From Swiss-Prot:
UniProt gene name: mukB
Region Flexible hinge: start-end pairs: 666-783
The entry's keywords: ATP-binding, Cell cycle, Cell division, Chromosome partition, Coiled coil, Cytoplasm, DNA condensation, DNA-binding, Nucleotide-binding
A molecular function GO annotation: ATP binding
Subunit comment: Homodimerization via its hinge domain. Binds to DNA via its C-terminal region. Interacts, and probably forms a ternary complex, with MukE and MukF via its C-terminal region. The complex formation is stimulated by calcium or magnesium. Interacts with tubulin-related protein FtsZ.
UniProt free text on domains: The hinge domain, which separates the large intramolecular coiled coil regions, allows the homodimerization, forming a V-shaped homodimer.
Protein name: Chromosome partition protein MukB
Source species: Escherichia coli O6:K15:H31 (strain 536 / UPEC)
Length: 1486
């Protein structure tokens, strides 16, 4: 037998009147006796404070305040304490014989509110020898002690071995420890529980019975039946969750298309934009690279154009310079042609004038002949006149010189005179004044030489005179010819000039004969020179074009090299054309192949996506279509196996559900018919009687009753007989046992207990051996244990069934997916990767484009080289035939030489043409020019002068000779005086002189007459000469003009000049044409350069913009990619098949999806705002944010208990798998969970019956309690009429109200409330909701009305009311009810506490003087029977016979108030025994 825990003592430390007082508590009744103010209430207040340290509940008021709602300001606690640390401790010993000290530390808090600080604590393991006062006080001396604060107490206890000190921060923890150690009867989990406990203590403290206590008895006595309520709540929660899940499934099913539409459109909207940006980024990169390539190409082209422009500008400058020269040359040639034409006209004039001159020449010659004859006659006349003159002069000379001396003296005198005269004459003749006879010899030699010279000259003149005399008539003609040829000249120069002219004429005729050959030679040479110059120009141009200077010797080798190069380049160009055609053809084939692959790529990608999904779903890798078909066969086999296993698990789960349902029946009845039969027979099921049997005893009782464990216990079997007749609705074996259901025991059988078995002796000749079942089902604990294990098994089976169902659905879906894959994609799924091939082909295409570009460049270079080589060969073909000309360095000199010779020859020809006739005429008569007839007189005079000079020289020589010879005569000076003259000879000479003078006069007259005629002839000659001279001057002027013109006016000159002009005009035209071509090409080149410059600027701008855009887009794209990867949506957005769509298609796709999304998210403000923000084309990351928001929204919409994934797409894929299975499963679960209204009514009724039976059992303990006229006390439990009607309708007429219970919109509680309102329309439900009302209706306590009844005197059983009972009767009745409550709490909490603990029982009773002695004795008896402790506060005149009594007397000693305590145990005739410590002297705090 388990001993009940007891309170051993109460210790008060530093309370008002109690410094350190320990009250030992009696095992039954402890009485505090004393007068008013003795400290009885303070003591019980200290006990209650230690028991319930909750300041919100503690309210110690006097009994006069019993009905007050508020007491003193401090609720009676602050005034019961003294300043400083105070303690209230309870020393207990529990059923395990463990000593536990619990208490509180109290301390007043200064302030107007008069608050008290409370700290609960507990001490375990304290030795029995240690008193509580020793723990919390410290003795200072014999009369002084100090109260230890809590921290010192803690340190003190921690120093004691085996002692545990616990300080609590919450009252719940404090009460939890007290409940676990068996100090209090009920676990006080909340403030409500503490309030109930305090109200119980308070009711016992102040005693009496009230309507408040009566109303709250249901809360105190009737257990909450949390299991049933929780079952209902769990059922409703499960049903609610089930219905919510079904509703969510239905919403999900209805939203599935919306989900699909939303995720599809969101994916299309974002993925299209994502792939468009990806494509655009790739396009932009390609464009940037293309721009860069074009930029480099354009720069190269611009540089080439600039070089070309420079070359063309240089060539244009050369052509401009050459054009100026050619224009000058052409102008010069034109001028030359004009000059030639002018010269030809001049030549014609010259020829006309020459003809006129020839005619005038003839006339002039005739006139000259006439004049010559006249001149001859005139000369004859002059000769005669001159002869006459000479004769006169001779005579005069002779007259002067004639003297002779006849004798020697005279001779010597004459010789001397002659010598002197000779000397004087020699001096005079020789003009030598200093001449002497001695120097004469020397001068003689000199004058002899002069004489010799004069003689030779005289002889020459003499010859001339002789010739002149013979050709006197032809001289004028020859002279005129010489003058006509040579021009005016001295007549004496005519002979020399004529001879020179004749020699020159011969040369000129010879030269003139060479004009035509020279002209032909010059024309040939000039042609060769022009060809040489053209060849040099071609060579220079060729060298310039070749960029290298070549020697003439290298040209032939270069020609051969160029011919070979042309042949090779021609072959290369031909091969290049073929190669280019092959490359083009391959490129077109590649392009066609790429196009076909690009068309096939989306289909292949779709097939690959499907294949990858299948691979991910099944975890297999498929390399061929055969693998797919083989796996499909395996999948079918796996599906069959999974279906078989699922059906097996489902069958087992159904069996478990049925067993759980059977075991969950109220009262342990496994057959519903037994409940009906028990109710019909007025009995109770045996399983219901043993419903509270423990789990350990369940196997024994199960084996004890065996098959009759489902028997019905009836009070009288005889009354059941009539009900058995015609009974068909019952089990095959129905056991009936006679007995009192309220006091049934197992004494009906004779039992022998064996090891894990029993032998039941049913009769003398019938025994039954029953082993203890391994899984007992007898009793609620066993059933609950079994149900718990079945629930665990059911959870495993449900999970396995769900897993298998999901696997089956997944396998079926996978089978369908494989079937769709085989039907749609199997043909292309295992083909080669078109994208890889596209990449290879693109790489090959790039190589081909590069090869084509290189080939084009090489071909262009080869073409340029070919053209250059052809031009070089063409130029060389024009140059090579002229190599000899290029090698002829002397050609120009020869041309100049020939031109000079031609000029000379032409001059000679013109001379011969002009003077040929004159020279022909002059040649026969040139000799006549040796003496000029007009100078005959002069010649004669010259001759005479020559003679004279000869004579003078001779005379001088003679005179000198004479002087030299007469050197001896100078000695005859004496003889000179003797000289005398003779005048006779002079006279004769004078006469002859006169005759000669007369003759001279006549000759002169004849001369004058003939001179006049000669003058006339000369005048005619002068007129002819004047005309001739005029013509001659004009001819000379024309010839000078012709010479000034400087051209050769021959017959081919005009043609050559015209040819030369035409050649120059052709060259000028060619030059101008080339210049125009160059100007046009230069303009085109400049335009091309401008275009290239603009293009280059545009390309640079586009390139830098594109580069900046690429860099900017790269940052944005990195943010987008980071966001995509962080949120794990790359697989959803990077749809490779979209890469093959154009930007317009993707934009159209995104716009269409945007329109659909606007409608789809119109009702969702968040998504609508995010979608609106995502429409910004400059912020692509916002579309990703929208996509993530859609995913998040869908994740939130997806129930994780339905779909176990965070990916909405996978959720949608799993949704279709799960929805049908979940719908079916949840529907069946709802049917299983949904308890019937009849079952609810039976549960509530059975619970009510059980509690009524329990109350009846509690009432048995109160049958012998009496107070005054109260003979007995009992609790009467009745079902309320309205609720009874509800139960009847639920059990009998539930089919009429199935509209409420079958509604999916109403929970069971709400349906129950609606039914209650329907049955009781007169009841006002107030503001309570149907759910709240339904939950109250599911609590059986609300069905019951509990009343306290007393059997009082002759009135019989009456309702216990304070007005009908005396104070003592009311106190006794209330105490009885409180004892019942405590016992009920213990029974209720028995399963929550250890089985080896029986809690302490203690109640209070203040002012017990209101009870008489009999009532007090009854309380003593009740306490003894119920093992309950009671603390009573009684006045001094109460002296109980049993228990312990403390007499308290409050005294004042030296202004200090204290309570004097004396304890007595057992007030009987024997001497009172003084309790230990009763004589303790009053003490004061130090």
């Amino acid at each position: 037998m388990i001993e009940r825990g007891k309170f051993r003592s109460l210790t008060l430390i530093n309370w008002n009147g109690f410094f350190a007082r320990t009250f030992d508590l009696d095992e039954l009744v402890t009485t505090l006796s004393g007068g008013n103010g003795a400290g009885k209430s303070t003591t019980m207040a200290a006990f209650v404070t230690a028991l319930i340290p909750d300041l919100t509940l503690l309210h110690f008021r006097n009994t006069t305040e019993a009905g007050a709602t508020s007491g003193s300001r401090d609720k009676g606690l602050h005034g019961k304490l003294k300043a400083g640390v105070c303690y209230s401790m309870l020393d207990t010993i529990n059923s395990r014989h463990q000593r536990v000290v619990v208490g509180v530390r109290l301390q007043q808090v200064a302030g107007r509110d008069r608050k008290v600080d409370i700290k609960p604590f507990a001490i375990q393991g304290l030795p029995m020898s240690v008193q509580p006062t020793q723990l919390v006080t410290e003795t200072l001396n014999e009369r002084q002690a100090r109260v230890l604060p809590l921290n010192e107490l803690k340190d003190k206890l921690e120093a004691m071995e085996g002692v545990q000190f616990k300080q609590f921060n919450s009252i719940t923890d404090y009460h939890s420890l007290m409940f676990d150690l068996g100090i209090i009867a009920r676990r006080l989990r909340s403030a409500s529980d503490r309030s109930k406990f305090y109200r119980l203590i308070e009711a016992s403290l102040y005693g009496g019975i009230s309507s408040a206590i009566t109303r709250s008895l249901r809360d105190y006595l009737l257990p909450e039946n949390s299991g049933v309520r929780k079952a209902f709540q769990d059922m409703e929660a499960a049903l609610r969750e089930n219905r919510m899940t079904l509703e969510a499934i239905r919403v999900t099913q209805s939203d599935r298309d919306l989900f699909k539409h939303l995720i599809s459109e969101a994916t299309n909207y974002v993925a299209a934009d994502y792939m468009r940006h990806a494509n655009e980024r790739r396009v932009h990169l390609d464009k940037a690279l293309e721009f860069r390539r074009e930029l480099h190409t354009s720069r190269k082209q611009l540089a080439a154009e600039q070089y070309k422009h420079v070359d063309m500008a240089r060539e244009l400058a050369e052509h401009n310079g050459a054009e100026g020269d050619l224009e000058a040359d052409y102008q010069a040639a034109s001028d030359h042609l004009n000059l030639v034409q002018t010269a030809l006209r001049q030549q014609e004039k010259i020829e006309r004038y020459e003809a006129d001159l020839d005619e005038l020449q003839i006339r002039l010659e005739e006139q000259n002949e006439v004049v010559a004859e006249a001149i001859e006659r005139q000369e004859e006349n002059e000769a005669r006149a001159e002869a006459a003159e000479l004769e006169v002069d001779e005579l005069k000379s002779q007259l002067a010189d004639y003297q002779q001396a006849l004798d020697v003296q005279q001779t010597r005198a004459i010789q001397y005179n002659q010598a002197i005269a000779a000397l004087n004459r020699a001096k005079e003749l020789c003009h030598l004044p200093d001449l002497t006879a001695d120097s004469a010899a020397e001068w003689l030699e000199t004058f002899q030489a002069k004489e010799l010279e004069a003689t030779e000259k005289m002889l020459s003149l003499e010859q001339k005179m002789s010739m002149a005399q013979t050709a006197h008539s032809q001289f004028e003609q020859a002279y005129q010819l010489v003058v006509a040829i040579n021009g005016p000249l001295a007549r004496n120069e005519a002979w020399d000039v004529a001879r020179e002219l004749l020699r020159e004429g011969v040369d000129q005729r010879h030269l003139a004969e060479q004009v035509q050959p020279l002209r032909m030679r010059l024309s040939e040479l000039e042609q060769r020179l022009r060809e040489q110059q053209e060849a040099e120009r071609l060579l220079a141009d060729f060298c310039k074009r070749q960029g290298k200077n070549f020697d003439i010797d290298e040209l032939e080798a270069l020609h051969q090299e160029l011919e070979a190069r042309i042949a090779s380049l021609s072959d290369s160009v031909s091969n290049a054309r073929e190669e280019r055609m092959a490359l083009r053809q391959e490129q077109e084939q590649l392009q066609s192949r790429i196009q076909s692959l690009m068309q096939r790529a989306p289909v292949w990608l779709a097939a690959q996506n499907s294949l990858n999904q299948l691979s991910e779903q099944c975890g297999e890798e498929f390399t061929s279509s055969q693998d797919v078909t083989e796996f499909l066969q395996q999948l079918l086999e796996r599906e069959r196996e999974a279906i078989v296993e699922r059906d097996e698990v489902g069958a087992r789960k159904n069996a478990v559900d049925e067993e759980i349902e059977r075991l969950s029946q109220p009262g342990g009845s496994e057959d519903q018919r037994l409940n009906a039969l028990a109710e019909r027979f007025g009995g109770v099921l045996l399983s219901e009687i043993y419903d509270d049997v423990s789990l350990e005893d369940a196997p024994y009782f199960s084996a004890l009753y065996g098959p009759s464990r489902h028997a019905i216990v009836v009070p009288d079997l005889s009354q059941v007989t009539e009900h058995l007749e015609g009974l068909t609705d019952c089990p095959e074996d129905l056991y009936l046992i006679e007995g009192d259901p309220q006091s049934f025991d197992d004494s009906v059988f004779s039992v022998d207990e064996l090891e894990k078995a029993v032998v039941v002796k049913i009769a003398d000749r019938q025994w039954r051996y029953s082993r203890f079942p391994e899984v007992p089902l007898f009793g609620r604990a066993a059933r609950e244990s079994r149900i718990e294990s079945l629930h665990a098994e059911r959870e495993v089976l449900s999970e396995r069934f769900a897993t298998l169902s999901f696997d089956v659905q997944k396998t079926q879906r996978l089978h369908q997916a494989f079937s769709r894959f085989i039907g749609s994609h199997l043909a292309v799924a295992f083909e080669s990767d078109p994208e890889a091939e596209i990449r290879q082909l693109n790489s090959r295409r790039v190589e081909l484009e590069r090869a084509l570009s290189n080939h084009e460049n090489d071909n262009q270079q080869q073409r340029i080289q070919f053209e250059q080589a052809k031009e070089g060969v063409t130029a060389l073909n024009r140059i090579l035939p002229r190599l000899n000309l290029l090698a002829d360095d002397s050609l120009a000199d020869r041309v100049d030489e020939i031109r000079e010779r031609l000029d000379e020859a032409q001059e000679a020809a013109r001379f011969v043409q002009q003077f040929g006739n004159q020279l022909a005429k002059l040649e026969p008569i040139v000799s006549v020019l040796q003496s000029d007839p007009e100078q005959f007189e002069q010649l004669k005079e010259d001759y005479a002068y020559s003679q004279q000079m000869q004579r003078d020289a001779r005379q001088q020589a003679f005179a000198l000779t004479e002087v030299v010879q007469r050197r001896a005569h100078f000695s005859y000076s004496d003889s000179a005086e003797m000289l005398s003259g003779n005048s006779d000879l002079n006279e004769k000479l004078r006469e002859r002189l006169e005759q000669a003078e007369a003759e001279r006069t006549r000759a002169r007259e004849a001369l004058r007459g003939h001179a006049a005629q000669l003058n006339q002839y000369n005048q005619v000659l002068a007129s002819l000469k004047s005309s001739y001279d005029t013509k001659k001057e004009l001819l000379n002027d024309l010839q000078r003009e012709l010479q000034d013109i400087g051209v050769r006016a021959d017959s081919g000159a005009e043609e050559r000049a015209r040819i030369r002009r035409d050649e120059l005009h052709a060259q000028l035209s060619n030059n101008r044409s080339r210049r125009n071509q160059l100007e046009k090409a230069l303009t085109f080149c400049e335009a091309e350069m401008d275009n290239l410059t603009r293009k280059l600027r545009k390309l640079e701008r586009d390139y830098f913009e594109m580069r900046e855009q690429v860099v900017t887009a790269k940052a944005g794209w990195c943010a987008v990619m980071r966001m995509v990867k962080d949120n794990g949506v790359e697989r959803r957005l990077h749809r490779r098949e979209l890469a093959y769509l154009s930007a317009d298609d993707l934009r159209s796709m995104s716009d269409k999806a945007l329109g659909a999304l606007r409608l789809a998210v119109a009702d969702n403000e968040h998504l609508r705002d995010v979608l609106r923000m995502s429409e910004d084309p400059k912020r692509p990351e916002r579309k990703i944010q929208f996509f993530v928001a859609v995913y998040q929204h869908l994740r939130e919409r997806i129930r994780q208990d339905i779909i176990r994934t965070d990916d909405p797409v996978e959720a949608i894929e799993q949704m279709e798998i799960e929805l049908s299975r979940l719908t079916e499963e949840l529907t069946s679960r709802e049917q299983k969970l949904a308890i019937s209204s009849r079952s609810v009514a039976n549960i509530i009724r059975k619970t009510i019956q059980r509690e009524q039976n329990r109350i009846r059992m509690l009432n048995q303990g109160l049958q012998n309690v009496s107070f005054g006229q109260v003979n007995s006390v009992r609790l009467n439990v009745n079902v309320r009429e309205t609720h009874a009607m509800l139960l009847d309708v639920l059990s009998e007429q539930h089919e009429q109200h199935q509209d409420l219970f079958n509604s999916n919109r109403l929970t069971f509680s709400e349906a129950l409330a609606k039914l209650y309102q329907r049955l009781n329309p007169q009841i006002d439900m107030g503001q309570r909701t149907p759910q709240t009302i339904g939950e109250e209706l599911l609590d059986y306590r609300n069905y019951l009305e509990m009343e306290v009844e007393v059997n009082r005197g002759s009135d019989g059983w009456l309702r216990a009311e304070s007005g009908a009972l005396s104070t003592g009767e009311a106190i006794g009745t209330g105490m009885s009810i409180l004892v019942m409550v405590v016992q009920s709490w213990e029974d209720e909490s028995r399963r929550l506490r250890g089985k080896d603990i029986s809690p302490c029982r203690l109640l209070f009773l203040d002012e017990a003087a209101r009870l008489d002695a009999r009532s007090i004795a009854t309380l003593f008896e009740l306490c003894e029977r119920l093992q309950m402790q009671l603390i009573i506060a009684a006045p001094e005149n109460i002296s109980p016979e049993k228990g312990t009594t403390y007499k308290l007397v409050r005294k004042v000693f030296q202004n200090t108030e204290h309570v004097h305590v004396v304890g007595l145990r057992g007030f009987a005739p024997q001497l009172p025994e003084t309790l230990p410590g009763s004589d303790e002297a009053p003490s004061q705090a130090s």
